[in-house]
């Protein structure tokens, strides 16, 4: 079954011989019919073929591997008739080394991916690993080499991201996340830490909010269970001084924390259109002048050095952009209108909007408008490495993952097969970028990005 899944995924990701340009060019040059056709592609195939050569020929190949690298395809054919045997050869030489996106490894889960692809740091090797959950509720930790380190069955699905904290302030990390009824804290061996998981007083539909006010690892965990809101310390104990214990309607997104001008701002949106701006005690810091018809878009904070140069932005359910100032007013002079159900995010200084099959990005490094063919776009993500910016977006309907660089161009070799938004990272800290995405059968792909 596993081999069959791999074959299906290779076909869908166009990682099979029939999709190779070199193979297609070769087939156009040689006879359609032959008694025997022997085909070799790239230098790795040539190395493999030496086992079928006589000693002198095999030795020649092994001694001249570097010189033979530009050979991208080789075919040898034999045709027999009643008296004679005819042979012909085809050799394709490529003087320019091609930049290709390669599938480094794949990992097959027991079921399709349910969670986001979460990157977590291995505190021993400093490399990045993957924490994911499949639809059978199995939680996996996967190494940077594509090996499943452990698998653990949970009772419920994980909500939102899996994050990391340094509970003991010793540079050793634990994974923190929640399900509908519990908050988990798990070490890198998959074991529960301290009194975790803690049972919630009431079920929640939202991921937890994780705050580190002073960047001193004295974490706070905010859980919004409908209209009720509970603040915990990092040991899973309730904070008694938290003031906003109840709202008139449920929170619609996890609360976010920002520091602007040396002051704390906790932002929480309610279902009834109320936007709360709180201090770290849960007391109201700013009263917003009007209610907002919130959509699925979270509140994005465009952060300056002061509150006067900062603002909160969202696109409401009618497609209207709301620019909320930190004095509580809404600046109508800066409002724009978009189509309903426009997805909006402000990330790394860039405004990212997706609607249907159209992607718009505006910012200091990437500026593009790209229309995909009848696509169903997932939210795009921006990444920056070594002063270069990249944007990943996936067409869920077409099962294609795209990667743009800051020249506003699609990177060579893309799109590639993928059903989830690609996550970009240098997994092994070797200067080589990896794009991680997954397929519909539960296969995770690690693509090399040149």
Give residue spans per PLM region.
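Blade-level signature of beta-propeller repeat domains, shared across WD40, Kelch, NHL, RCC1
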Residues: 421-450
């Amino acid at each position: 079954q596993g081999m069959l899944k791999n074959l299906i995924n290779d076909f869908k990701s166009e990682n099979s011989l029939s999709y190779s340009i070199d193979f297609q060019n070769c087939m156009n040059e040689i006879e359609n019919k032959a008694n025997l056709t022997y085909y070799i592609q790239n230098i790795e195939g040539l190395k493999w073929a030496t086992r079928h050569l006589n000693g002198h020929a095999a030795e020649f190949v092994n001694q001249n591997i570097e010189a033979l690298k530009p050979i991208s395809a080789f075919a040898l054919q034999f045709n027999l008739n009643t008296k004679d045997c005819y042979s012909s050869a085809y050799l394709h030489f490529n003087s320019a080394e091609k930049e290709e996106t390669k599938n480094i490894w794949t990992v097959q889960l027991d079921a399709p991916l349910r969670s986001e692809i979460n990157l977590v740091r291995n505190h021993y090797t400093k490399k990045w690993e993957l924490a994911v959950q499949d639809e059978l509720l199995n939680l996996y930790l996967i190494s940077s080499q594509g090996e499943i380190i452990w698998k653990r069955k949970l009772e419920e699905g994980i909500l939102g991201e899996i994050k990391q904290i340094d509970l003991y302030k010793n540079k050793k990390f634990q994974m923190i996340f929640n399900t509908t009824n519990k908050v988990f804290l798990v070490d890198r061996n998959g074991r529960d830490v301290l009194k975790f998981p803690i049972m919630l007083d009431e079920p929640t539909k939202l991921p937890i909010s994780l705050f580190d006010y002073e960047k001193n690892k004295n974490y706070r965990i905010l859980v919004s269970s409908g209209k009720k809101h509970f603040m915990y310390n990092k040991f899973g104990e309730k904070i008694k001084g938290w003031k906003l214990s109840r709202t008139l309607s449920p929170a619609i997104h996890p609360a976010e924390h920002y520091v602007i001008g040396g002051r704390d701002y906790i932002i929480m949106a309610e279902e009834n259109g109320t936007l709360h701006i709180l201090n770290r005690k849960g007391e109201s810091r700013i009263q917003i002048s009007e209610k907002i018809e919130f959509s699925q878009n979270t509140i994005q904070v465009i952060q300056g050095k002061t509150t006067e140069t900062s603002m909160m932005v969202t696109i409401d359910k009618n497609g209207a952009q709301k620019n909320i100032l930190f004095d509580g007013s809404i600046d109508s002079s800066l409002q724009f209108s978009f189509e309903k159900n426009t997805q909006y995010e402000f990330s790394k200084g860039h405004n990212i909007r997706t609607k249907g099959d159209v992607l718009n990005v505006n910012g200091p490094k990437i500026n593009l408008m790209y229309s995909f063919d009848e696509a169903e776009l997932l939210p795009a993500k921006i990444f920056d490495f070594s002063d270069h910016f990249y944007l990943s977006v996936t067409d869920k309907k077409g099962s294609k993952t795209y990667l743009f660089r800051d020249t506003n161009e699609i990177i060579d070799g893309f799109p590639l097969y993928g059903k989830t938004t690609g996550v970009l990272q240098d997994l092994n800290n070797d200067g080589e970028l990896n794009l991680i995405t997954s397929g519909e059968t539960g296969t995770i792909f690690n693509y090399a990005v040149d």
